[in-house]
Each structure stands twice: as C-alpha cells, then as structure tokens.
Amino acid sequence: MSARPDTPTHADEKRAVLYGHPIPENSFAVRDLQHKLPGVGLFDLRRLKSGAHACTFCGACQKKCPVQCIDVRLDRSRTHGTGKDRHFAGTITIDERRCVTCNHCMETCKFDALVPTELYHEHRRRVQKVASREPQLSSGHGLCSGCGAGIVVNQVLSQIDSHYVVSGATGCLEVSTTRYPFTAWKGSYIHTNFENAAATLSGVETAFRALYKRGKLEEKVKFIAFGGDGGTYDIGLQALSGAMERGHQMLYVCYDNGAYMNTGFQRSSATPLGAWTTTSPVGAEQPGKIGHSKNLTEIMVAHRLPYVAQSSPHDPQDLMHKAEKALAIDGPTFLNVLSPCPRGWRSDNDSAIELARLATDTCYWPLFEVSDGTYRLTYRPRHKKPLGMWLERQGRFAHLALPGNEHLAEQLQVFVDEEWDLLLRKCDEIPEAQWDKASSRHKAEPFIMHPRRQHLESLGEPLTASMTYTATEWDDF
C-alpha cells in the first residue's frame, strides 16, 4: 500500500469538503485516495502531446472489472474545452489488494489510457503464483453443484506452503469429502464429531508442541479447523470458545450457510430473520424464522484474539489475504466466511458467487478484520444496495413479498442498517449518510421485492400469506 502524501492534494481537500469533516487517518476513504495519484499504484495514466491525460473518465474500465476494484469519477467542475482541446478531470481509484490483474480494464479502454507500472507486473506475478497452486480439495467430492464450502476451503488452503492438519466438524463439507474409503483432502485430515472440531485440533496442536520441545520435530505444521454454522455457532461453540481462550496455535474457519443444511435445512442461530427452514416453516402462525441471527464474529472479538476477520468467497483476494495473515500469527485466529447454499437458499446453482457479492454490497455480510482489537473495513460498497436485491434471489425469502409479511423484510433492512452503522463507528469510518453525499450523482430508487413467484405458483396453491410449505414441497422448489 502506498504511503499517503504529506501535502494534501486537491482530491484530499475536495473529499474532506464533501464529507463535511476531517478524514480519519486510517479510514477507508484515506486508503481509497492513496491510489488516485498517478504513478503510485498499479497504473499510471498515459498523457497526450498536449500534456493532458488520455483518460476521459468514461467509466468503461469500471463496468468491465469483474471484481469491482475500480472506481471512476468525472469532475465536471474541472473539465473544460471542446473537441481535441478538451481536458477531462477526475479520479480513478484502483484497489490493488483486490485487483486480480485480468487486464480487462486495459483491453476495454479505447484510448489506451491505463499504463501498467512495475508494481502491476509484480502484483501479477504474485497472483499467478497463487492461481497456479494445486487445489488442496480435489475434484470428485460430493458437494452440491454451486456449493460455496469447497471454494472457501481451496481459497484458505492456497495460502499454506508447509504441512498442515485439518480438523473437520461433521456437516456438509465432511460428509461430502470423506466418504469411506475415499477422501478429497490432499493433506492430513481428521473427521471429528459435530461439536468438537476445535477441541480435537487443540489436542493435536498440543501434541505437536510437545514434540517440538523434545526436538523430535523441526518442520512447523499449520493447524486449521473447518466447521459450518451449525457446528460453530451452536453445537461447537463451547469447544471453540475454550480453544480460543486457551490460546492454541490454530485457525478456525466457519463456513456460514445459515442453517443445518446437511441434515435437511433446519434453522440455526445463524439463520436470518424470516428465512424458511424445515424447523421455521412459513404459515399463518409463523412467517419463517423468528429473531435475528447471532453475531459470532463479535463473540470471537470478545475473546480478545490477535486476529478475527469476516470474508466472502466472491472476493478471493480478500479471503486469501486474510487467511495468510491469520496463519502467520502466533496464536488463535478466527475467520467467518459466508458460504452460499443453493439447496437451502433455494437459489440457482450458478448464483453462489453473485449472491455472496450481493450480501456484501447490501452490507448484510460486511468484510472487515479486527487485529488486536483494532477494527478495519476491508471493503466498502460504492453504493450500498437495498437488502431486497439479495432477498429476492432466494426462495427461502419468497414469502416476504406476500401480503402481511412485508414488515419482516423492512425489519431485516433496519437491522442490517443498524449493524452496518455500528461497524462503521468501530472502524472509525465516515457515516453512510455522508458517504452517500459524496456519491451524490447516484440516486437511490425505491426498491420493491420481486421474488421468483413462479416457483410458489408451481406448487398448485394460491399465493396467500397463510400458506404452509412442507419439506417435500420445498424440495421441489
């Protein structure tokens, strides 16, 4: 990350005016600005003979970027002239931590305005090295089509160059990758009970530590536990809390799909308000799950761990970077990763990554990290999207658009907004209202949910709020 210049730039001053108060030193806005100065990041801007930049700030590169790491803003107040003499002014922000060096931005620019720097080529070599590593979870496993868990595992384990031991709690990931006598794991793997993945790994780590002290082992081994939300938020919370409090050298990764998916879609304490599950059915007496989900990430922060982070598989650079940091720390660390489940969420098999991205852009699942008690936001949506855009893509929330249930979607939106504002304060970030003011050219439109009602109609019953769906009927969803 480039250092911030000592002298405030025009962009600094303008951003401060837009926000209405000084910018906090470690805020997302300051880090955002660091890439706006030509020559200090991955790209420079090509200059014309007149001395002006070739870039017209048209936004084509921003639209083409598959990982949304580019932000283009045209400053009309400083754009002047006509025809060939026209000079464009604005800012281009490129998040070098998120960039995957796909070259789409340069290929789509018809003015060849973006010129890669040596830093870009260095970053590209680093990305290609990670991409060329052999996946540690082999193909041929039994995970459902579109499951997010396998993606999470391979992204986390891609950051390990040494030997490792994985402890896997009973759940979707375990039963689908370790069907006796076969295994999809290329490293050492221990299948534990539902509730004791962290406890088992604690014993393994302690045994290795004893062997190190006796001089019987020299090579350092990494210890990683994987558990779903059922085995982490609920059944395995006691073992997890104990392992974290005792300070074992291990990384615990929770792949959160929002319910007990392996055993038939029962609700867990990670299930969102209003979601359909087989134990929180939709009907006249109960419109889905009652109550909001537990904030496990904050519970882990309360354990005063050296590193806690929340991530998502749609942003591999973010997840892999956090896994790398967590594995390098001497002590217990925790990652909470969203893991879309097409079967349980009643979504399309090819929509997992898009749903993960929407969860982040609606701020239902923000990306942040806490290092030794210091909060830091690692991604902030350019324009925060309405939660309904995420809800309507999932059949488990389809009933929220029916008469009498609209208030649940509103309650969930209010809850997400409050949690997001609280996180912004913890991260010393600019409030959402002032962030929107800085993006004044974006006009938020009222959002109305349009779920995939044809799936409900296919059940052969009228669309009413009093409908109750059995597990069998929803299996046909």
List each model region and its residues:
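Glycine/aspartate-rich loop-and-adjacent alpha/beta segment that forms the canonical ThDP
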Residues: 2-4, 319-477
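Generic beta-strand/beta-sheet core signal
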Residues: 73-75, 117, 167-169, 253, ...
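Short Fe-S-cluster ligation motifs
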Residues: 88-113, 142, 174-175, 364-379
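Glycine-rich ThDP/TPP pyrophosphate-binding loop and its adjacent helix/strand module
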Residues: 219-223, 234-251, 255-390
